[in-house]
């Protein structure tokens, strides 16, 4: 974030936790941990920046805030997790695994818009195309994920999916993995 972005973040309230649930991100986590004196959380097996310590996010373990639980992918090449917030019928917070990038926005160049459209990025209730290529996930994880009760999804890529996230992602899991 630039200075204006940091000011906007500060205006939202106190940053107490920096949570890394996706292996393909987090290069600036140490900056935010230091700036805010925040607790750093990662999935087991994720690298931790030098000079930073991290608490481990594990299903059934300690979590960054009350009313939160952790889902861990067990059949991927890199660690990845999803947080489930027990509010409003269940809210999933995902990084790269679940995406809801419906259309490209004004920040896409024409070239990237064409490339990413061709790669299958702009799909409602999607599994991240690059994440799929890198991680080669298995259906067993999505069968487990499908068992979670959730109505909404906040994905690291795309718009919030409200009210029908459980049904829409379940249909995607069935289409891609037969579960």
Regions found by a protein language model. Give the residues of each.
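Metallo-beta-lactamase
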Residues: 1, 76-177
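Active-site HxH/HxHxD metal-binding segment of metal-dependent hydrolases
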Residues: 6-64
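Alpha-helix boundary/capping residues
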Residues: 12, 39, 145, 176-179
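Short, glycine/acidic-rich beta->alpha junctions
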Residues: 24, 74-75
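Short helix-to-loop capping/linker segments positioned immediately adjacent to catalytic or ligand/cofactor-binding
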Residues: 29-30, 70-72, 80-81
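Short, structured secondary-structure boundary patches
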Residues: 61-63, 175-178
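Short Pro/Gly-enriched beta-strand edge/turn motifs at strand-loop
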Residues: 62-73
């Amino acid at each position: 974030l630039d200075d204006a972005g940091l000011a906007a973040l500060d205006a939202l309230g106190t940053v107490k936790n920096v949570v890394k649930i996706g292996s393909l991100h987090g290069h600036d986590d140490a900056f935010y941990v230091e700036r805010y004196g925040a607790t750093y959380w990662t999935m087991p097996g994720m690298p931790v920046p030098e000079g930073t310590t991290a608490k481990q996010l594990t299903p059934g373990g300690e979590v960054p805030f009350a009313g939160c639980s952790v889902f861990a992918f067990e059949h991927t090449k890199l660690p990845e997790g999803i947080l489930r917030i027990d509010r409003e019928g269940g809210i999933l917070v995902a990084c790269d695994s679940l995406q809801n990038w419906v259309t490209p926005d004004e920040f896409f160049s024409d070239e990237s818009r064409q490339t990413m459209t061709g790669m299958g990025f702009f799909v409602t209730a999607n599994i991240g195309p690059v994440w799929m290529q890198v991680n080669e996930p298995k259906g067993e994880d999505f069968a487990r994920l499908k068992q979670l009760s959730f109505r909404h999804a906040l994905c690291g890529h795309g718009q919030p999916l409200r009210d029908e996230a459980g049904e829409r992602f379940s249909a995607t899991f069935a289409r891609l993995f037969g579960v």
